[in-house]
């Protein structure tokens, strides 16, 4: 595997964790990117190639829908927040409500908090625009505060050229180049 070529003389693989590795402030990983190890297939489980040295343990962590949790916090989206508190899988809940596969519901959940419209959704899910709009309408009926937060965040970034994150970090936007549509993703990811 390509990972073998990156091991040191002790057969250890090291990566670089970049604490502010993206413009939005999201953690990133490089050389190699161990945040993007391929998912298991029927043929091969890529993660099985990673083995801890004797006396050590490998740890794998998942943020468990952290972006959706932050979006609920910022938007005061109580309906979804209650589902999270009750241990529900929000992607499965959305899938059931819209009568679609979980993978499509996940795209809608994340798409909505980043401002996806019917045009982009229809392309992502390979469905007609009318159906995409129906999904979005139903979704916004279920979780109306996300639409409110998206509008408020974009207007604030457009007016002031900056947003402040819960960490105190400030993200500046070039208003002249209309980058304020990225304000929501920076708010959630930063």
Identify the residue ranges that each predicted region occupies.
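Conserved catalytic core of nucleotide polymerization and phosphodiester-bond processing enzymes
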Residues: 1-190
């Amino acid at each position: 595997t390509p990972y073998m070529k990156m091991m040191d003389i002790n057969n250890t693989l090291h990566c670089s964790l970049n604490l502010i590795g993206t413009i939005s402030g999201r953690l990133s990983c490089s050389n190699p990117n161990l945040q993007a190890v391929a998912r298991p297939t029927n043929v091969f489980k890529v993660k099985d190639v990673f083995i801890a040295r004797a006396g050590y343990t490998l740890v794998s962590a998942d943020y468990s829908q952290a972006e959706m949790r932050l979006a609920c916090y910022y938007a005061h989206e109580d309906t979804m927040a209650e589902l999270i508190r009750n241990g529900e899988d929000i992607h499965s809940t959305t899938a059931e409500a819209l009568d679609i596969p979980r993978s499509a519901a996940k795209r809608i959940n994340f798409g909505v908090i980043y401002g996806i419209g019917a045009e982009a959704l229809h392309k992502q899910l390979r469905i007609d625009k009318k159906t995409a709009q129906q999904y979005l309408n139903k979704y916004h009926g279920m979780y109306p505060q996300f639409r409110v937060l998206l509008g408020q965040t974009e207007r604030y970034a457009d007016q002031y050229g900056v947003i402040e994150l819960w960490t105190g970090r400030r993200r500046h936007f070039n208003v002249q180049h209309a980058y304020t549509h990225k304000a929501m993703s920076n708010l959630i990811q930063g």
